[in-house]
């Protein structure tokens, strides 16, 4: 079992984030000791890493709550989890397209300035 400080160090998350995630019910496997301090076993640590990854992918807290509440037992739960992940994939693809458009704009600006500098230098 890991204390909140140890779990934060192991996952790279802040203690604040761990408290937030457990308070929002994202880590159902978290336990409490006799002093009501959070304790994280292997299952809770795995859940933390899952939540961390989903957040890094841009998934909302609400979507993660739905995802984690479904569990992994049964075809219906797996299908519902798949739908949540597919929706996130669609969002990520849209964001990637927007980023590529912005990058194209920047590249055109860079080329324009390089051309302008070369023209000024030649004069």
Please state what every model-predicted region is.
Residues 7, 14-17:
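Short glycine/proline-centered loop/turn elements that form peptide/ligand docking sites
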Residues 3-5, 9, 28, 42-123:
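Arg/Lys-rich, alpha-helical DNA-contact motif
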Residues 28-35:
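Beta-hairpin "wing" of winged helix-turn-helix
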Residues 25:
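Glycine-centered, phosphate/nucleic-acid-interacting loop/turn motifs that mediate DNA/RNA or nucleotide
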Residues 35-41:
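Minor-groove-contacting beta-hairpin "wing" of winged helix-turn-helix DNA-binding domains
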């Amino acid at each position: 079992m890991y204390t909140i400080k140890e779990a934060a160090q192991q996952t790279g998350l802040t203690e604040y984030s761990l408290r937030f995630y457990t308070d929002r019910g994202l880590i159902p496997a978290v336990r409490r000791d006799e002093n009501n301090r959070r304790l994280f076993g292997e299952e809770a640590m795995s859940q933390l890493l899952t939540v961390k990854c989903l957040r890094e992918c841009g998934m909302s807290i609400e979507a993660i709550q739905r995802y984690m509440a479904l569990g992994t037992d049964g075809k219906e739960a797996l299908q519902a989890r798949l739908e949540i992940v597919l929706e996130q994939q669609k969002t990520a693809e849209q964001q990637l397209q927007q980023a590529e458009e912005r990058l194209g704009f920047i590249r055109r600006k860079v080329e324009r300035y390089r051309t302008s500098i070369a023209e000024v230098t030649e004069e």
